[in-house]
Every structure is written in structure tokens, then in C-alpha cells.
Amino acid sequence: MALLLILVATAAFGGLDTVDKQVTPFKPGEEFSDGEYTVTIERARLVDELKGTHGSPKPGKLYLGVVTTLRNDGTVPGRLRDQLDLRDVPGKEFFGAFRFRDGSSIQTLGPGLTEQLVFAWQVPEAAAQSLQEVTIRVWKKKFTQLMVAYGGKEWIDTDNYGQIVVPVKGSA
């Protein structure tokens, strides 16, 4: 009961989250290291379909593709799904990560490898019409031991991130 009262009192005065987040701005074409990957975000574009993939045209939807070069600086394969955090785009749905060279789907990137990728989201056409630019966060990570005794190490997001604003080209 006492613990509950302490938590309620703490929440009333701003909660337990006192971590100061550190934001590192970067620009298109600049490298940003999140600890696991070195990321270079090149450009963003809206298209009706993703050629070479299973991204066929969908009524009322467009694809937002963000072209990125990624280098895995770690010693283990890294997952790609949550690598880019697309902000403030209503109704967005992550569609996948694809190799730029051939459109093949990619889920992980091995240690020491570099790949030019397209991260794609489906966005409602109504929201896409007003997209002049998009804000993307890349969360810094640390390689840490998991809490369970038999668990291995894992890349975990920290409270710090890099942030980039990328102009969006309309569909041609």
C-alpha cells in the first residue's frame, strides 16, 4: 500500500521519467552513427507502386520511400524494421525494407555489410498530398546483456536519437 501511495505521489509531481533526451540533428547525405549502424539518409519520395516488390498500387494509398545507405558497425546481424522512426505522418503503416538495387525484401543486415535500402511506408493519399517534408528519428542504441540469465546481448534503443528532416518529392 505504501508503494502505491509513493507511485501516485510521484506521478502527481511529474512522474519518474527525468531522463534528458539528447537530440543530434543531421542532414540528408550526412552519416549518423546510432551505435549499431552508420546511417545516411539520402532522399524521400512518394510513389504509386514499389516496382520490383509486392508493393502494387492500392486505392487511396501511396508509398513513401526513404532511400538510405546503412552500414552494420556491430558484430551481430541487426534487424531493420524499426531502424527509422517516421514521425507525424497520420495513418502511416510500415511496409518494409527493400534493397535499392533489385527491390528484394531484407529483414536483417549482417556485421560489416553496407547496403543501399529503401524503407517504405503506406500512407493515406489525403495525408500524402500535404507532405512537403518528413521528420525521421534514428534512435541511438547500446549493446547490452538481457535481464534473463540465459539471454544473450541485444541492441537496445536509448533515450537519445538523431533527427533529420527530409524533403519529399511527389510521385511522377
Predicted regions and their residues:
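Short strand-coil-strand connectors
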Residues: 33-37, 89-91, 139-141
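The feature marks short-to-medium sequence segments in extracytoplasmic or secretory-pathway proteins
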Residues: 47, 57-58, 71-117, 121-122, ...
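Short, well-ordered beta-strand segments enriched in hydrophobic/aromatic residues
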Residues: 64-72
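Short, surface-exposed ligand- or partner-binding patches at beta-edge/loop junctions that are enriched
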Residues: 123-150
